[in-house]
From Swiss-Prot:
The record marks 105, 127 as: Interaction with substrate tRNA. It is an enzyme of class 2 (transferase). It comes from Xylella fastidiosa (strain M12). Monomer. Its EC number is 2.5.1.75. Gene3D superfamilies: 1.10.20.140, P-loop containing nucleotide triphosphate hydrolases. Catalyzes the transfer of a dimethylallyl group onto the adenine at position 37 in tRNAs that read codons beginning with uridine, leading to the formation of N6-(dimethylallyl)adenosine (i(6)A). Pfam families: IPPT. It comes from the Bacteria. Its cofactor is Mg(2+). This is tRNA dimethylallyltransferase. GO terms for molecular function: ATP binding; tRNA dimethylallyltransferase activity.
């Protein structure tokens, strides 16, 4: 069999709070790599503490890509990510470095590695019309309308998910075809890379739960509430009728802090709700990761030497 001459890339996945960011940096230092963030929240400027965003020292130690590229009142789609990540990968490979893609946003990984079917681009006027109808009639009503034209997509979207309802209706109104119909098209060509998929996840669920709780407490101690308050009072966000519908503000921890600052519940309830929401996020991520049948799983506390051996075998073959 001829040797596989495609450039190598590392895909490092895992649930939140599993230690992916530091491991990605360690791999980059050891093997001459650059890190590409695969995270739908790290793209936003100003969301630092609550996202456990790699700090300045970490980002100075090895090059990082696709962090702090959007304002929090902007939208950034999986298609946007796939386009930007491909450009970053091409640049890294041309430099002779190793692309290391790390994060926990499954949709972004799928968009990049498996490809997305072509869909109509965003249409600002149609979006504005849908938003106005939602303000008048409610997103639940628009969800019902979506079900009438695209029952398959509506069944996958919760009635309280305005971003996805809006996009599904936008696709239908712009093209006259349902989103599910578009998604049934063959995807674009996959990446021409030789990929090693690693999953970093504690073996025992209790360990992950402990890490989640400790990390959120540290976020609060490090000024998360002040960070959220700065976002709440930013003119571009404060002027919005429904700022909590922004993708950035729907991130785990940020919505709960916002609601606490609005007086909806106590500091203790804020902590409990945020930890519970983060656990649910981790559970969803683990469910998705179990479907990645070609991925190798590692425990962050016990498998460092095993990761080293797997990396060496992959890169030297």
């Amino acid at each position: 069999m001829p040797a596989d001459t495609r450039p190598a890339a590392i895909v490092l996945m895992g649930p939140t709070a599993s230690g992916k960011s530091q491991l990605a940096i360690d791999i980059a230092k050891r093997w001459g790599g650059e890190v590409i963030s695969v995270d739908s929240v790290l793209v936003y400027r100003g969301l630092d503490i609550g996202t456990a965003k790699p700090n300045a020292a970490m980002r100075a130690s090895v090059p990082h890509h696709l962090i702090d590229i959007c304002e929090p009142w902007e939208t950034y789609s999986a298609a946007d990510f796939a386009h930007d990540a491909r450009a970053a990968i091409d640049m890294i490979v041309r430099r002779g470095a190793l692309p290391i893609l790390t994060g926990g946003t499954g949709l972004y990984f799928r968009a990049l590695l498996a490809g997305l079917s072509d869909m109509p681009p965003a249409h600002p006027e149609i979006r504005a019309m849908i938003a106005a109808e939602a303000k008048r009639d409610s997103w639940a009503t628009l969800h019902t309308r979506l079900a009438e034209v695209d029952a398959i997509t509506a069944a996958r979207i919760h009635a309280t998910d305005p971003q996805r309802i809006q996009r599904a209706l936008e696709v239908y109104l712009v093209s006259g075809r349902s989103m599910s119909d578009w998604q049934n098209q063959p995807p674009k060509q996959r990446l021409p890379l030789r990929v090693l998929k690693l999953v970093l996840a504690p073996t025992h669920r209790k360990v992950l739960h402990f890490r989640i709780a400790q990390r959120f407490k540290a976020m609060l101690d490090n000024g998360l509430l002040a960070e959220v308050n700065a976002l709440r009072t930013h003119p571009s966000i404060h002027a919005m009728a429904r700022p909590l519908d922004l993708p950035a503000m729907r991130a785990v921890g940020y919505r709960q802090c916002w609601e606490h600052l609005d007086g909806m519940y106590t500091a203790e309830m804020l902590y409990q709700r945020s930890v519970a929401a983060t656990r649910q996020l981790a559970k969803r991520q683990l469910t998705w990761l179990r479907g990645e049948l070609d991925a190798l799983w590692f425990d962050p506390e016990h498998d460092q030497s095993r990761i080293e051996k797997v990396m060496e075998a992959f890169l030297n073959r």
